[in-house]
């Protein structure tokens, strides 16, 4: 996981990240959907790039289907966990610490993914456009780019100015949100059990809501096009209560390779 503007995020709790996320994310279903998309589009299974890879859940599952996997994130601690997972699965791979808005990998990829609303962490519009340009420059002509977002509805109505909490034997957290316009700031306080005591640490995360139409205009400007959109990686109707949209993106054949 990474943010568009450099920011220390997801560093202190990389080792408990999977436990916190597991209840809300069905990685296997999401990854199988992406693999099915590749098969249906006859995508070559040579090079796979996972952006804002976090602890490598996408990388280590989808990467089994590709000859080589590259996992990118800004958090060294997340990359360390991802690297362990990739090696454990026997996947030919490397991890790279880079900002997804300014990629410089000197190769192109058949599949690029950016999951778990990492695109929403890109707050500035110019950085968002740079992100899509970077993807376009690293995507092969017949390749596919799959990313997902938290919708405007989720950010403004579900997250909004609300508070949440999580309480298990080893981990407790309190999550307070503040919504200002299109941007939600999420302050999280964690208490993680270590021996007989709980260690506290704090994280602040910021996401921005983007309309589908604005995202599509940025994608087009970067020389790509929207092939289809999925409701949380499922072929269901997208409506005003949809919380997550996955975009399936291809190079626009009408545009020159950038």
Locations of regions flagged by a protein language model:
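Conserved class I S-adenosyl-L-methionine
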Residues: 2-44
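Class I SAM-dependent methyltransferase SAM/SAH-binding core
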Residues: 49, 56-102
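A short acidic, Gly/Pro-enriched loop at the edge of an enzyme's catalytic core
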Residues: 104-111
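Residues lining the SAM
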Residues: 115-117
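A short His-aromatic
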Residues: 120-122
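SAM-dependent methyltransferase
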Residues: 126, 146-216
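A short glycine-rich, Lys/Arg-flanked "PGG" loop and its adjoining helix->strand segment in the class I
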Residues: 129-141
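C-terminal lobe and adjacent flexible extensions of AdoMet/dcAdoMet transferase-like proteins
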Residues: 212-258
């Amino acid at each position: 996981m990474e943010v568009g503007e450099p920011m220390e995020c997801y560093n202190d709790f990389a080792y408990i990240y999977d436990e916190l996320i597991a209840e809300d994310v069905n990685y296997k279903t999401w990854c199988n959907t992406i693999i099915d998309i590749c098969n249906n589009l006859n995508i070559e299974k040579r090079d796979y790039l996972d952006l804002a890879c976090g602890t490598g859940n996408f990388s280590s599952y989808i990467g089994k289907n590709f000859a080589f996997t590259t996992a990118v994130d800004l958090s060294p601690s997340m990359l360390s966990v991802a690297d362990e997972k990739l090696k454990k699965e026997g996947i030919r791979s490397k991890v790279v610490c880079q900002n997804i808005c300014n990629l410089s990998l000197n190769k192109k990829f058949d599949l690029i993914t950016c999951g778990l609303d990492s695109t929403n962490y890109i707050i500035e519009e110019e950085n968002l456009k740079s992100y899509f340009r970077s993807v376009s420059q690293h995507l092969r002509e017949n390749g596919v780019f799959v990313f997902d977002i938290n919708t405007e509805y989720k950010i403004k109505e579900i997250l909004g100015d609300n508070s949440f909490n999580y309480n298990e034997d080893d981990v407790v957290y309190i999550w307070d949100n503040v919504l200002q316009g299109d941007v939600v700031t999420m302050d999280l306080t964690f208490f993680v059990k270590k021996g007989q005591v709980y260690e506290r640490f704090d994280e602040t995360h910021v996401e921005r809501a983007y309309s589908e139409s604005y995202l599509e205009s940025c994608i087009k400007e970067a020389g790509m096009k929207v092939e289809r959109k999925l409701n949380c990686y499922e072929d269901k109707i997208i409506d005003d209560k949809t919380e997550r949209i996955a975009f399936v993106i291809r190079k626009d054949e009408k545009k020159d390779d950038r």
